[in-house]
Amino acid sequence: MDEALIFSRLDVPRILTAWGAGRAVYIPETAGAQTAFALFNPERGLSLHFGNTTLSPKSFLFPQTECLLRFATRGPEAGLCQTEPLGAQKRLLFGVRPCDAAAFALLDRVFVQDDRSTDPFWALRRERTLLVGLACNSPDETCFCTAMDGGPHNTAGLDILACDLGDEVLLRPVTDRGRALLAEAAQAATGVPARGERGGAALGQAETRRMGAEAVMARSPFVPGLTLEAVSRRSQRTVHALGIWPRIAETCLNCGVCTFTCPTCHCFDIQDETKGGSGRRVRNWDTCMSWLFTAHASGHNPRPTKVERVRQRFMHKFKYMPMNLGGRPGCVGCGRCVRQCPANIDIREVLRAMDMACRIAPPSSLIPDEAVS
Amino acid sequence: MNAYARRIREIAQRLLAEKRVDAVLGYRAGTVPMRARPFVARTPAEAGELTWTGFCVGNLARLAAGLGGRLAVCAQGCVSRNLVGIVRENRLRREDLTVIAVPCLGMLDARKIVTRMSGRAVTGVREEGDEVTVTGADFEEVFGRGDVKRDNCLTCLHRNPVLADEVVADPVPETGGGDIDKLIELWERKKPEARFELFTRTFRDCIRCYACRDACPLCHCATCFVNRSNPQWLGKTQDEPDVLTYHLLRAFHCAGRCTDCGACESACPAGIPMRRLTSKLESDARRLFGHEAFLSLDAKPALAVFSPDDPDEVFS
Amino acid sequence: MNAANPYLPFPARLVEACFDTPDKSLRTLRVAFEDPETAARFVYRPGQFAELSLAGKGESPIGIASSPTEGTHLLFTVSRVGLVTSALHALSPGDRLGVRGPLGNGYPLPDLAGKNIVIVAGGYAVTTLRSAMVWLLDPANRKKYGLITFIYGARSPELLLYPDVWRGWMGRDDVDCRVTIDNACQGWDCLVGFVPRVLKDVAPASEGSAALVCGPPAMIRFSLPVFEDLGWQPEQIFMSLENRMKCGIGICGRCNVGNRYVCKHGPVFSKAELDRLPAEY
């Protein structure tokens, strides 16, 4: 199915049920102040009115705890490691916001780099997971995807993008898998092709909602002028040596909330565990906020205090990742860290501080800077 | 609250102008609705940003020890007790600390407000006396302060600071009016299996972010037990025994020292009702040892002293 | 590198091991792959490292001390500092371990063909430089390079590693081998003096040369100015970094110095590259 289809809003549960044949379907559900992806239950229905999930959906492709290898600790096979087989479970996530989808596209480049650096666990889960996004019509105060090379109706990383038009829902295929998925939907419910007058009206409505959403973000005191431009121009040494870091770090608690709720944070730890005759090598999410993250066994720690660790996080997002990924910011502007940081350290403010400091910092004395205006 | 903010600014500006302190640790307006941010003011001009609202949650004593120099801290009852704690535990010297005492009328729970809004975005909150007005793009609703107050503020036993070098307002009624021991009944009525089931259920959503630990002023060990790798005391996975062990061990480390300030609960991104543990710790200390943590600089902590007639019952 | 799963180590056995120093803090392990096919396919370069894996304990990134010209056995010199390295020290011949690798970029020796090579080593940082030296002095490679100078120092004679190898170089006329200790000691037949001092005496010409430098921070701090005074450029000097590692393949995000991962873009970096990175190591 190449073109977009318009469905009645009331048909969405039926479509999800159809997509559930041979797949586990997850949708966002709100309970109190928390929203999370949960298994779709036709009897409970679904709501298209939610902001975003409290935790990012990255755990579907990159679980917080994941067994990599297993081994015996006794007998002739002791110490021989076997790869942990991944289940054949196919999944579909419905309601993924464009920011989180962009994060998946970014993490694809982190987990699958080249022959030597390909994570088979991510690759397999990615292949077995379909992503149906829900375009954002009313961004939150803390959203800033437009400043991070994203947009409320962007399709990067998605198989299908759904747009809520009130009584109707517009489903737009993005990938070949999305096209096949849309064909399945068309079997379950009546979808009107988005062409001609009817289609044009629907597409126009979606466009209006997109512009409205972008306007909301443009009205935020934080978004206009928020850019990586100056940071990308200056050398990493210069950005690292800026005087802003101690002040930014002084109220940080160095917990892991920002890193764990962030859709692009991907750092992990690898540990061995044994019990009786068997054991496993397991990976867990880790956080650069932790002292242990970079501690050498000798006792030396290149990031011994809070300041170095806080600086590392923002340098990674706004300098190192763009350098390694051809300019793509390491942040997608989802706003979770802004909403959830216990100390209300605002990444938008930090970027603004980096940007302003980069504009005025004198050239680095040790090496010629790329471009100083 | 506005009068509070004015007084705090006056005091802070004076202390900084007279160079009696190097910095004032307080709060300034948050960047999102229903938040206030910890803030370190180092000049009288910066002190102009200090504020005080019902969203000054978290516990500033957590940051006080790490800032160095001569520090003034805006402290309500619970925070002032934790300041006593870090002085007693040698993380800060009394002579380097100036306590700006803020008698507390209880803080607000942003999550309670969000839940009542049923998905409608909040753009602002006004506090006027006993009324809390919540506004959004197309609505305005008024609540009684008690309806949206934080749970531990409802049951607070010491709303007036126990240390005071500067005073922001006249003392307020000492207790929050709620019955703190009623919360304990949640545990007391249950048999061990049921207690374990409640404990497990409470921490089901924990993501091991350690925000509870990092928000807590009691957790100031140079190397936390969680970060030790030789020997490693507990696993780092999401397996239930590891998650529960972390919380259990941390609770025991806090026993007898916890003021039930609720910073852990405010910090938790998963909305875990951490107070189910902290309130029990606080209650047990009172019941078993007749002790409330850090009410004065002279009182010895309950678990740092042995007396032959100490009860044999342990924190349970 | 295991193609299907880069986290899966190759099974290997400890052939033999010996302690290098009287205090037993360093132990050199000779390791053989269990599967001859793996051994044949394990192609590595001097300067690369491997994650030595002990199932149940964990992994530790250790530089490969052997040269690929020495056959299919691998040599690793392990310093006992923590959980995994203590377990590596406790292995007996015949015990199983895992080898994951080869990892890292290695010294850019092929790019330096035709040049004079100066190797400056201090303490037990000499491990991967042993690999480089043995490789360079192999008949297949020696003729491709100009002068080869080896400067290696330790606090005292018993702390010098691999005497079986460098004593042999002393007698050769195609390598200038200078081994030194900090303070004079009875029975010592080689040089006395700190490594930077010996380097200054050697005064290697910068023209058409390259240097591989590995040692403790103090040695590095005093050796680099010697090179600078002799007119060496940062592009000519190569160093090997260490950092806490886990995945070893540039994914887990932990070992970075600036935008470079020590495990993947390093551990070997030129001084010119390091000068562009924040000094956070």
Predicted regions located by residue number:
Chain A
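Ferredoxin-type iron-sulfur electron-transfer modules in oxidoreductases and energy-metabolism complexes
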Residues: 225-250, 268-373
